[in-house]
A protein has these predicted regions:
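Conserved beta-strand-loop-alpha-helix hinge in the C-terminal portion
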Residues: 126-156
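Conserved ABC ATPase "signature" region
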Residues: 28-45
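Conserved ABC ATPase signature
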Residues: 49-53, 57
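Hydrophobic anchor residue at the start of the ABC signature
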Residues: 63
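Catalytic "switch" loops of ABC-type ATPases
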Residues: 3-8, 101, 110
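A short, proline-enriched helix->beta-strand linker immediately N-terminal to the Walker B motif
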Residues: 68-72
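Helical segment within the ABC ATPase nucleotide-binding domain
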Residues: 88-100
Length: 167
């Protein structure tokens, strides 16, 4: 899932969610698509085109399209950045549940999101990759988990102290 939603303006929500299958010549399972659209909270928008959706709704359509795919490795680039706090938490929970048996590479600029969702955290900086945290289950961590706040603080300290921390 790219940071930009990459929705097709001429296609409605259901057609956009089925895009991967259509590109593979499989047509797409519209029943499954409608179930996934319901899971992301957009049932009432399923026949709308992207230009009539908000940025957060568009991002949820892109997430629904990703949820439709049964791949062993999932790449998510800032998948929750356009969402309000409540919807972000709900979509993080949904993604964590749906992708629990898959390898997920999550790109985020949000240390709280990384601590809540990730088993391993790596910092990409100055063309290098550094492992900075290995976390234990459960995932996703509860948003009121006090240990999560301590881990987030520790992560921010490590980010600030890392080489090249100057902007």
């Amino acid at each position: 899932m790219a940071q930009d939603d990459l929705l097709l303006d001429w296609a409605d929500v259901v057609q956009n969610v089925c895009l991967g299958a259509r590109l593979r010549g499989q047509g797409g399972d519209k029943t499954k698509a409608k179930r996934v659209i319901q899971q992301v909270g957009l049932s009432q928008h399923s026949q709308k085109r992207p230009q009539s959706l908000s940025g957060g709704q568009r991002q949820r359509v892109a997430l629904a399209r990703t949820l439709m795919e049964q791949k062993s490795v999932i790449l998510l680039d800032e998948p929750f950045s356009a969402l309000d706090a409540r919807t972000r938490t709900d979509m993080q929970d949904l993604a964590a549940e749906q992708f629990k048996d898959q390898t997920v590479i999550l790109v985020t600029h949000d240390p709280g999101e990384a601590v809540r969702l990730c088993q391993s955290i790596y910092l990409l900086q100055d063309c290098s990759v550094n492992s900075i945290a290995a976390l234990s289950p459960p995932f996703p961590k509860s948003i009121d988990n006090k240990a999560m706040f301590a881990l987030q603080s520790e992560l921010m300290t490590q980010i600030r102290q890392s080489k090249g921390a100057d902007r």
